[in-house]
């Protein structure tokens, strides 16, 4: 099964790296994918992550390397305009930063793994129900 990993799943795994989420990410059971945009989001919030995790920068980079090692990163340029448009229609009232994740899920007919309940609720109201709930 292909699973699109949202940024907040990575954040949660970093904040509690012994969590069930981190274990699932480190496992080889599912094929995880994410847009390159995930990197931007992580490094945009790097200082906040360091503060909350109390990790050193080297420890954070090592943990990120482990967590991201099982994720295949995909450029949004490889997503069809049809999938991007559907994702835009679904995300425009929530947060356009979610668009690349939703578009990947549509493009690959994949499950979306997110902890963003506002996003889940809105997508469900628009008949998107392909959520990964481990």
Feature-to-residue mapping (PLM):
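Short, well-structured N-terminal submotif of metal-dependent ribonuclease cores
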Residues: 1-34
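Hydrophobic side chains within alpha-helical segments
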Residues: 9-11, 44, 101
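A generic structural signal for short hydrophobic patches within well-formed alpha-helices
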Residues: 10, 39, 119-120
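Residue-level signal for well-ordered alpha-helical positions
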Residues: 17, 45, 125-126
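Short amphipathic alpha-helical segments and helix-helix/interface helices
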Residues: 21-23, 61-64, 101-102, 120
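PIN-domain endoribonuclease scaffold, especially VapC-family toxins
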Residues: 26-29, 33-88
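Acidic, PIN/NYN-like endoribonuclease modules and their adjacent C-terminal/linker elements
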Residues: 34, 102, 106-134
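Active-site neighborhoods of divalent-metal-dependent phosphate/nucleic-acid chemistry enzymes
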Residues: 73-115
